[in-house]
């Protein structure tokens, strides 16, 4: 029997899964076209190459979309660009922390900081808060933690 976890997912299939999330995001006025979903799949692939990461199970882009779609700081105009930046930032932090933070915890912390201390600023999220996340995760050796504004 083939292990489903290790079966590669085609970019077309992944883009289709992203478009299917429109059912969840439309209530917030956010919608992706198939072309935009393909763009996000390509951003993910480039980010993985840039950081030297390998992804065994698809769905990370969908988890980021689900986590951020309710943010008051997202708009239709910058939705794809913001998601692209979040995908890249996610991979950067995972690499810099040697995967000491689970995907779920990292996404939760990114969303909390984005809506909280960063007030929707990707620059603040990348430059200040995420650098603190990396330092703290590395200092604690991966112990579970929650980020605070003074972290």
Predicted regions and their residues:
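Extended, low-complexity, Ser/Thr/Pro-rich intrinsically disordered regulatory regions enriched
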Residues: 2, 138-151
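Acidic, low-complexity, intrinsically disordered interaction modules
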Residues: 34-35, 39-144
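Short terminal alpha-helical segments
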Residues: 1-49
């Amino acid at each position: 029997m083939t292990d489903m976890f290790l079966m590669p997912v085609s970019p077309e299939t992944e883009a289709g899964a992203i478009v299917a999330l429109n059912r969840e995001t439309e209530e917030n006025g956010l919608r992706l076209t198939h072309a935009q979903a393909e763009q996000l799949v390509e951003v993910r692939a480039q980010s993985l190459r840039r950081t030297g990461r390998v992804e065994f199970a698809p769905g990370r882009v969908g988890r980021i979309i689900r986590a951020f779609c309710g943010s008051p700081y997202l708009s239709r105009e910058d939705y794809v660009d913001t998601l692209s930046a979040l995908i890249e930032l996610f991979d950067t932090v995972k690499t810099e922390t040697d995967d000491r933070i689970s995907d779920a915890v990292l996404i939760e912390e990114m969303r909390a900081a984005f809506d909280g201390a960063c007030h929707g600023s990707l620059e603040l999220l990348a430059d200040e808060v995420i650098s603190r996340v990396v330092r703290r995760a590395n200092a604690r050796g991966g112990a579970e933690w929650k980020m605070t504004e003074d972290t």
